[in-house]
Each structure stands twice: as C-alpha cells, then as structure tokens.
UniProtKB/Swiss-Prot annotation:
Species of origin: Phytophthora infestans (strain T30-4) (Potato late blight agent)
Upper taxonomic lineage: Eukaryota, Sar, Stramenopiles, Oomycota, Peronosporales
One Pfam short name: Pkinase
Annotated catalytic residues: 219 (proton acceptor)
Location of the region described as Disordered in the Swiss-Prot/TrEMBL record: 30-50
Protein name (record): Serine/threonine-protein kinase PKZ1
Protein's UniProt keywords contain Nucleotide-binding: yes
Name of encoding gene: PKZ1
Keywords: ATP-binding, Kinase, Nucleotide-binding, Serine/threonine-protein kinase, Transferase
Amino acid sequence: MLRLGRSAASEVSSIRNSLQLQLEQRGARPMQCAYQTQSHSNPEGAKRGRSPMSLAVMGAAALSVGLELQTDGIAQARAAMEPGTQLQRHKWQLFDQIGAGAFGVVRLGMHEESGEVAAVKIVPLENPNDQRSYPALEREIAALKLVKALGGHNSIVDLRDVYVEGRKLFLVTELARGGELFEQIVAYGSFPELKARDVAREMASALSFMHRHGLVHKDVKPENILMSARVVDHNSGVYRKSNRHESSSLVKLADFGSAGPASVNTNLEDIGTAAYLPPEVLNSGLCTSACDMWALGCVLYIMLSGSHPYDLDGMSADSVVEHRVKSEPVTFDFSAWDNVSPHAKDLISKLLVKDPTLRLTADQMLQHPWMNASAEAAAAGLRRPSPLLAGQPIPISPA
C-alpha cells in the first residue's frame, strides 16, 4: 500500500504558494508530465444513454476476467486504461515525494491550468519479469474507472487521470490532505463517538454504492481511509478545510488494488490485510460484500476504543488473531468502552457476526439507530453525563 506522509496534510494554499519558491531555491525546475490527448473511445462504455447497471455489469466483467498480462509492462499498462469512462488527459507538474510503497512512489502534482493539487502515484514499468504489481495495478485502475463511469461517490477517492510516459505509469487521484485515518488514531487516540459516527456513515454510504454495482473493496482498514481535512482539535471533533478544492466529505475510501467482484476460493495474497479478514475468508476463501462490512466493523471498533477487536494490545501473533476471529465473540469489557453508548456496541456486534448471511449490509447499517439519531438526541444520548453534572435532580427512593 502507498502510505501518504504527514506532509500531505499541509493546507493546499500553503503548498501552492511555496512550491515554486522551494524549487527556485533548489535551482530545480518542476518535472513536466505532458501526455498528448489520445482517443481511447469505448463505444460500449461511453455511449450516451448507457444505464449505470449496464456499466456496472461491464465493469464487473472486466474485473472478473482480468486484463491479459503482457511481457511488456507498457503494453499491459496501456491495456489497463482501456475499459471504462473516457478521461481527459492533462499536463501535471510534479513536486516533492509525499509517500512511498512497495510498487512506486507518490508525488505531489499540480494541474498546469486549474492549479488543482493532486496525488500522483508513479509506478515504474521497467522490469517485465516482475509481474507482482501488475494485477493489483490493473484492479485499481479498473475499479477507479468503474466508479467514475458510475458517476463517482463523494467518499471514494476520485480518479483524475491515468497515463503512461516513458516506462512509467502515472495514476492521478484527488489529494486527501488530512492523511490516513490510522495516523489520526495514532496521533490523537480514539475518536469522539459523534465524529466516529460521521466517518462510519460516510464509509457505509461508499460501500453501499460499490456493493450495488457489484464491486467489493476487499481491503477496508484505517490505513485505506483518508481524511479530507486537517485535524485542528481531535477531542472536540473540529476539522479545518482550507481551499475551494476541499471535498465536502470527511473521509475518502482509497487503495483499490484488491477490489473486484465477489469471489470464491479467493487467493489471500490478492486481497486485504489478515487482521481485517472475516471468518468465511479465512475458512474457505469466500469474499463477498459481507467481507467489507466485517472490516468496517473492525475499523469502527478501533475508532471508538483505540484497539483492534481481536488484538487488543497489538502484540498477538497472526495465528492467535485468526483463531479469535474464527471462534471468539467480540467483547467490550475494558475501560475504553465505559462511556460508549449501547447503540454503538450493538452496531459493532452486528457487523462482527461470524455468519456472513446474518451480518449487516451497508444499507442496513445506514438504517441502524446509532446511525440515525438526530444531532441533538445523539449529543444527549450517545454519551450520557452524570445527572449531577447535568444539573438534574436524582430521584431518591424512600427507605
């Protein structure tokens, strides 16, 4: 996975004002990423009047069949760009590296005309014998293009551009300036319940959108949920947006390298992270939309307590975690849960049900009482203060 560093959380206005100055001080010029506009018309996918469901079926078929591996990485990358919606090609200036991963780096990019700042993942395609990155790269491009063809979702990272230049592939997505949800939890601790609910609602909405169109993320975890805005005061739940390019959403689901249709006999190397896999995947390789809901239950547990539901101290061996996932119920019997509402615990319990057929779907999660309390009721009821602190009389039973 490509992890964005904390520098990505800088306000875009500061980035824009300082980038050219930094480069001039270094005596460097920004790299020009010119990509000549080409016609990649797909009459079946781009035809006017194509229904979202037709696009979904087409996209799911492309994902399930997969794109043929070529001995030349360039040819393979070009093939990966063919399915899906037509994207407008632009020139991007590349600046400082803001992240790195197993298969490439992420650099800050700026659109030459609009000034939009984006995250540019750069994947070298120089070694045709190293095929490890290609399937994940193909899945990510196909999934992001399918989401875009379906109209996109405010809580799913948006694909801005994808092109090949030289022997490198450039994948341009919107920049989530607040960094990873994981980093926020590490830096600031567990979330206030109301803010955790906001994140959970957006993620459930994003997954509902994907699942309706036959797409399963297969790697939902705090590292793959990006914050749209910089944290100002985590304890009070205050976030700052600094620019007109800021998204109206709080979070963005990212990293679609494992995404695809539901699958059976799934190769565990092609999906998710072991700590977030549900029992049915570990037992039989069955990976459906229910897998995403299990993982989201783990994420919500972590947001509210700061601990993983099956690895409370973060020190357990994978085999121990796997045993607990398969056989032990989720528990809330430590102090971090003392002030968390019963509704929140009930929702998590229904997401971490062992039987995938009984697990809440994304739509059912959105209808859960914890998700639908009004702001006033939630503020009064999700964390119940002592009657004395609330200035309320305490009834005293006669002796």
